[in-house]
């Protein structure tokens, strides 16, 4: 199948070398298509349970979404029932419908049970999915529980259950609240900061002041050590179904609204920090560089797919600083708006890349993207299982970030590099 769609073989060295500037999106679409064919978002159920509970508790502090026959606490009850019934091995589970409904009704009541089943159970998932371009209308990523034959339900394997449940939950809320994605994004920032503080990791959120004392943006998460200043930007937006279906323009728009925008926000602060040696913060303190290394890290709430690595990321960003998207003859209004969003983000990225280069010596062999990391929150939560200080967390994030192993999987690479480090010690 990979050969049929020309996304294989992937040489482990392929992404060391930047693609031609005019073919940057084409190269990225091959990665997206490979992911669509062969990867499914996955996460440790423990991470996902904490994320679902904490994130939506933050979202609903101000108000609640009503009208669907169940409350958020009921959805958490369904999640816990599914998790209790799912096989401990990484395989799917079949369970009698009566058994699941009984457990759920005991937890949330009969009325909420019926409403939840109507909302979350898929009867014929992907019935119209034949080729990757059909992903635009597919529900692959929402398949947590499916109606099966023989009076049974199918429950997704534990590694995939969390992301599927989360995607379905967000999709259901989006039908009732058009601003839910913005609310989730704000809650994600607050939740991640609170999570690290609970673990004892020294960190803070910072509001940066410009030269005239006005707000110049914020840093969602700031970690400092004696050797490193790490600036984090947290983003909710991931890749949309249109991108998964092979729409190159939508890919550019998705990246512009998520990753590229995050890099632009962090780059602005990094440039000011390197130029002035410090950032003035709204709380009256100053963030001083003092010769330390600067790291930029964009953390995504969404899973962008499994098969990207640091080389793909850096080559992508470097191709973007030499790219402008041109309108085709048959763009509709929505596509034209997406094109404008993408080009604005690219223009900002290009100007900041030039400004950054002016701060460096003539012989410098680094650019704006050499210190850039990009991970989803599932991987960060994985690291937080063992890392409880800013120093150890940053060490884990940075180890091997300049290496290309060919795995294109942060979890695999982290395990391999950890094993190698332990052997040496």
Regions found by a protein language model. Give the residues of each.
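Active-site metal-binding core of divalent-cation-utilizing nuclease and nuclease-like domains
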Residues: 205-219, 223-226
